[in-house]
Amino acid sequence: AVEEFLTHYADGRETWLDGVRAYARAIYGKVLARNDRRRFLDKTPRYSMIVPELSEIFPEARFVILLRNPLAVLSSELRTYIKGDWPLLADFAPDLLEAPARLVAAREVLGDRLCELHYEKLVEAPAEELQRLCRHLGLPWEPGLDDYSETPAPRGRFNDPVGVHRHRRPSSDSLETWRELGRSAQTRAFALAYLDALGDDTVRAMGYDPAALRAALLHIAEAVAVEAEALHALCGDESLDGQVLSRLAALRDGVHD
């Protein structure tokens, strides 16, 4: 209906584009003026769904896409938001299932207006990656730009609820936490199914090796099985079993040696 209205009573799609641009100028312009700034960074995972539209609306804008190991993304969502409440996963289906392929497709849409970063490189060599980003954006590099400890956190709920407040700079502490997905049969099967749903072509296009990710999950499963066998052997002796149970009970009750 909107398209027909614009076609018959205005200048078609260009009228709609002008309207959206005017809306954005009003909103972002007020924020910039109030904070005495010249540039505005707007970031949300859901923008992956409308990259072509954003490119058309803002033809001079620069775009930054941050890619991450898809299993690390899955692990983060499960730990941060789902927390065992599995029906909540439906709310994150677009981010988990659709966004990766759309981000890959954005390369063709955005061309040289796109700067692509990988999370792993960013946390391991933040200064180098941020210098590359600054060059793309035409911004001067300032030493210490990777130290965000003095930067005020965004007001409201629009920030990282878990990790960012624990560090002064990008940290690699969480690089390997995704491997925990391999420790239980349920999460391991879910992670493997997730890789299948994304498709190997998409995972590779993101810069990751799907075969290596699957192998890592299975290797962790084998290690867990060895641990279980060792524990079973330890507890097979009745006296040792009693000692183990007593120790666990003491730890539960806060009793320490």
Residue ranges and their predicted role:
Residues 1-42, 47, 172, 194, ...:
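PAPS-dependent sulfation machinery
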Residues 8-12, 118, 142, 184-187:
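Alpha-helix initiation/capping motif
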Residues 9, 39, 87-88, 118, ...:
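Residue-level detector of alpha-helix boundaries and kinks
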Residues 16-34, 48-49, 53, 57, ...:
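PAPS-dependent sulfotransferase catalytic domain
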